[in-house]
Design a protein with these regions (language model features):
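Long, well-ordered alpha-helical segments
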Residues: 1-19, 39-61, 84-102, 138-165, ...
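Short beta-alpha connecting loops at secondary-structure transitions
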Residues: 18-20, 28-34, 64-80, 112-121, ...
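Short, charged/polar, low-complexity loop and linker segments
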Residues: 16-25, 62-69, 187-199
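C-terminal amphipathic alpha-helical interaction region
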Residues: 141, 157-276
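Alpha-helix capping/hinge segments and adjacent helical runs
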Residues: 49, 71-149, 245-270, 274
Length: 276
């Protein structure tokens, strides 16, 4: 994206001595690159958290800490398996798109990454299976035990950062997302008690809804950690701006997932099988 010259920036030429500007000056290319960057870096933070919980389970001398880590990891596992693999597909598709037609041939290596990412949503349980595991077994059957653990983490972090002026723009939407997550889960549970099909109808949207909030938490923590570190200003800015993009452009996806969940199972089950 920094090397390929194509068209001129809408605001005027950036490289007047060249026949065109690099495609990274175009907003839509930035959208694709930032989406891939935000999902990938956030996913790494979540995956490392999962690994740290495994260490606690295997190594801690504190029985209560081991149990807490096990309950939390049990809840997060389908999110890690389901969301991270789907986001890998999205990120690799955006990267391939930035290459244009050249990305579709073997020379760039991008097509291999796209194919490798795609299979991850199938093996080790498809996305639909991970979603059912999250909503059915790990949330409703446990009365939301793992969810409560994670919500407690969010509340504690938001409370800790309330007076930090660098975190204001992230804390308010994160705290609201936590409240909405709890209320939506209760509503699904109520509906499932009346119609078990609601679990299957809501599960995939609930998986992504949960995943985006989990990643919002890790992006907020990443910004707080970066700002408190001795890293160069350029590093801190990159974290802050990527987090801002995530909160303003990707976290709002939860709203469409919530709307789909609340529309109910009827629109999925009404059509006769013969019509497909």
């Amino acid at each position: 994206a920094k090397e390929r010259l194509q068209m001129r920036a809408l605001s005027g030429p950036k490289l007047a001595d060249k026949p065109a500007d690099p495609i990274i000056v175009h907003p839509d290319v930035r959208r694709m690159l930032l989406t891939a960057k935000a999902l990938t870096e956030g996913a790494r933070a979540l995956a490392l958290h999962g690994s740290s919980l495994l260490d606690v389970i295997a190594r801690s001398d504190d029985a209560a800490a081991r149990q807490h880590a096990d309950e939390l990891l049990s809840f997060l596992t389908p999110i890690i398996k389901g969301c991270l693999t789907e986001w890998a597909v999205e990120a690799s598709n955006h990267a391939l798109q930035c290459f244009g037609g050249h990305g579709y041939i073997r020379e760039s290596g991008m097509e291999q990454i796209a194919r490798d990412a795609r299979i991850t949503t199938i093996y080790e349980g498809t996305t639909g299976i991970q979603a059912l595991d999250l909503l059915g077994r790990k949330t409703l059957q446990t009365q939301g035990m793992g969810l409560k653990h994670f919500l407690t983490m969010i509340v504690a972090f938001c409370t800790e950062q309330t007076q930090n002026p660098q975190m204001v723009e992230f804390i308010a939407p994160l705290a609201k997302s936590a409240q909405d997550w709890q209320q939506l889960t209760l509503e699904i549970g109520k509906r499932a008690g009346q119609n078990p099909e609601e679990i299957g109808a809501a599960s995939v949207d609930y998986l992504f809804y949960s995943g985006y909030i989990v990643l919002a938490y890790w992006w907020a923590r990443s910004v707080a950690a970066a700002e408190a570190s001795s890293q160069p200003d350029a590093f801190k800015k990159a974290k802050r701006e990527t987090a801002r993009f995530y909160f303003q452009r990707l976290l709002p996806r939860t709203q469409s997932h919530a709307a789909a969940i609340l529309s109910g199972a009827g629109n999925l089950m009404a059509l006769e099988a013969e019509a497909f």
